[in-house]
């Protein structure tokens, strides 16, 4: 666990494995943090140099007031600046893999369009980027996060997170506690509000899809995702026909939590194809 200064933004990240191995970068979703990936980055570190970062405005990273940070373009710039700061893309021959969940998938795809010579693999997990408007559960999520009464917010967040799972009984109380702990930090609600407004009504442009057609891509989706339903998985199929597609059965919006072993198997198999040292 480390902090690094990314162009003036104090940024938190987890790092595992040997820096000589290929870099695999994990990008979380809206209102989340690097801890959401749990043991997966560590497990992959036997063969990869894995890094899970807290986006600007989220987790333990700094939460600046400037609104430009909280657009897809702003987050993409932040990730590129982060990669440059930690040295992931400094070498001319450097190749990385990007793994993004939900909002993180949208950001990862955007980064891939800008760094297509550097991005070897792209993994989109229950990704946003094709929403025309917020889904009903996304609106509930926003309302819960914006609730100022801590007791009411706890109950609202608990209900929303339960609805994100295929089986609500799998939700650990600590996940609700962690969300409430982070959202109460100075600037966190501001970051959430701006990010929600800037990411749930915009889409990956056609040129963006064209730019990443030849990037090795895996799209993973929870079969019972209520936040970004599986119809968006079908829409990605049309936009990225060369990608590999996998549905995780009996999983909701975060299949890496509900079906960790199966998710890890799919992910590690994909990443292990043509794996090389730096």
Predicted segments — roles?
Residues 6-9, 14, 55-99, 265:
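Active-site loop/oxyanion-hole signature of alpha/beta-hydrolase fold enzymes
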Residues 9-12, 16-62:
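Conserved HGGG/HGGXW glycine-rich cap/lid loop of the alpha/beta-hydrolase fold
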Residues 11, 152-211:
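Conserved alpha/beta-hydrolase catalytic His-Asp/Glu region
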Residues 100, 104, 108:
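Gly/Ala-rich beta-loop-alpha elbow adjacent to hydrolase catalytic centers
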Residues 109-113, 121-152:
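Flexible "cap/lid" loop of the alpha/beta hydrolase fold
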Residues 212, 219-221:
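Short beta-strand/loop motif that positions the catalytic acidic residue
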Residues 224-228:
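Acidic catalytic loop of the alpha/beta-hydrolase fold
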Residues 243-278:
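Catalytic active-site module of serine/aspartate enzymes centered on a nucleophile-bearing elbow/loop
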């Amino acid at each position: 666990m480390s902090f690094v200064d990314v162009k003036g933004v104090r940024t938190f990240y987890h790092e595992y494995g040997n820096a000589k191995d290929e870099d695999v970068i994990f990008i979380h979703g809206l209102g989340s943090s690097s801890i959401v990936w749990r043991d997966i980055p560590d497990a992959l570190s036997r063969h990869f140099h894995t890094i899970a970062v807290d986006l600007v405005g989220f987790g333990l990273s700094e939460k600046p007031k400037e609104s430009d940070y909280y657009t897809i373009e702003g987050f993409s710039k932040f990730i590129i600046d982060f990669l440059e700061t930690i040295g992931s893309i400094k070498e001319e021959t450097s190749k990385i893999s990007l793994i993004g969940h939900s909002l993180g998938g949208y950001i990862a795809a955007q980064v891939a369009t800008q760094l297509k010579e550097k991005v070897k693999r792209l993994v989109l997990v229950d990704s946003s980027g094709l929403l025309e408007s917020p889904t009903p559960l996304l609106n509930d999520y926003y309302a819960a996060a914006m609730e100022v009464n801590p007791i009411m917010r706890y109950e609202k967040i608990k209900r929303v997170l339960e609805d994100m799972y295929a089986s609500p009984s799998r939700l650990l109380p600590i996940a609700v506690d962690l969300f409430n702990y982070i959202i109460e930090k100075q600037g966190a609600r501001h970051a959430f509000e701006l990010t929600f407004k800037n990411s749930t009504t915009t889409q990956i442009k056609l040129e963006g899809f064209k730019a990443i057609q030849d990037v090795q891509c895996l799209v993973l989706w929870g079969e019972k995702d209520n936040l970004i339903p599986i119809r968006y998985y079908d829409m990605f199929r049309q936009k990225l026909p060369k990608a590999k597609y996998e549905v995780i059965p009996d999983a909701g919006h975060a299949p890496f939590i509900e079906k960790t072993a199966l998710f890890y198997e799919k992910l590690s198999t994909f990443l292990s194809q043509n794996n090389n040292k730096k």
